[in-house]
Structures are given as structure tokens and as C-alpha cells.
């Protein structure tokens, strides 16, 4: 009986995740006050990071091959965001067995150091933000304008390995 209930719960949570949809364009920033820990131990919220012209939220992780393919552009993206007065934050939504799968805070610190990241890389405890955003893949970005309204959601660019100019 317990096994059946467990299987039903697992199936229903997977079913929900698979069919989750990203928030629609025009949506306000979800859960902007939730504090997340970044790799330096600092606690930040999306409101803390948002700048005059908006906010770029990047859902990412350490172990996804697609994330690795885009890594060389993360610092460029953070720099371009800052130059345009747009806040930039990368959020790791992986929560289940985080440490066992290479997604723990120490793993994130090592990963970030290996790529010389120069931006906030935070932990989304319990995947609360990922679920609120409807983020279902990594990397996946959400760009909000100065009013905190979503104007773009999707991939970083047209090709993870060789972007078109």
C-alpha cells in the first residue's frame, strides 16, 4: 500500500513537472522577495538584484551538457546586462539529492571557479523559484523590463556551441 502511494506521488510530481509551462510574457517577477544563498554565502532576492532597466534570470546547473555548451557566454551575458543596467542572476534549481549529483553548494563554488564566473550563482532551495517561473530546462532565461514584466523567456541564443553573429 505504502509503495503504491509513493509511486503515485512520484508519478504525479513528474507529470506536473513535465507539463509545467513557463510564465507568459507580461507576467510580473515571481517570488521577488525570496532570499537565496549564493556561492559566497551572501543571501539575495530577485528584488535585490534587479536594476534600473530590469532583471535577467538564468536557470542553470553544474551537470547539464547544454549548460556546459553555453558556459563561455555566461560572463559575457552578465557583463552585457550590467552595461545595460540590467541585473543578472544565475539560479541552480536542482534540489533532489543535490550533493549526491554534483549540485551542492561546494560543487557550485568549484564549478563557478573553474569557469571564472563573475556573477551571482544561487541555490533555489526546494526549487520554489523554478516552479514559480515554470522553468523546466537548463539553461533557461527570463528577461524582465524596468517595470518587472516578462519580455523574453527561452534559450540564451540560437546555438549553444557557435552563436550566429
Language-model segments: residues:
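Loop/turn elements at helix/coil->beta-strand transitions in domains of secreted/extracellular proteins
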Residues: 51-55, 84-88, 116-120, 146
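Structural microenvironment flanking redox-active thiols in thiol-disulfide oxidoreductases
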Residues: 68-114, 125-130
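Bacterial N-terminal signal peptides
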Residues: 8-18
Amino acid at each position: 500500500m505504502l509503495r503504491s502511494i509513493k509511486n503515485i506521488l512520484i508519478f504525479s510530481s513528474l507529470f506536473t513537472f513535465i507539463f509545467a509551462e513557463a510564465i507568459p510574457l507580461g507576467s510580473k517577477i515571481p517570488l521577488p522577495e525570496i532570499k537565496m544563498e549564493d556561492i559566497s554565502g551572501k543571501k539575495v532576492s530577485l528584488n535585490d538584484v534587479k536594476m534600473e532597466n530590469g532583471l535577467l534570470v538564468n536557470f542553470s546547473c553544474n551537470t547539464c551538457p547544454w549548460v556546459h555548451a553555453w558556459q563561455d557566454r555566461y560572463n559575457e551575458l552578465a557583463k552585457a546586462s550590467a552595461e545595460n543596467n540590467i541585473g543578472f542572476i544565475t539560479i541552480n534549481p536542482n534540489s533532489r539529492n543535490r550533493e549526491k549529483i554534483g549540485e551542492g553548494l561546494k560543487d557550485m563554488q568549484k564549478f563557478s571557479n573553474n569557469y571564472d564566473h563573475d556573477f551571482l550563482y544561487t541555490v533555489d532551495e526546494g526549487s520554489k523559484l523554478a516552479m514559480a517561473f515554470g522553468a523546466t530546462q537548463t539553461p533557461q532565461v527570463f528577461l524582465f523590463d524596468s517595470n518587472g514584466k516578462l519580455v523574453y523567456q527561452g534559450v540564451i541564443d540560437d546555438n549553444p556551441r557557435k552563436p550566429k553573429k
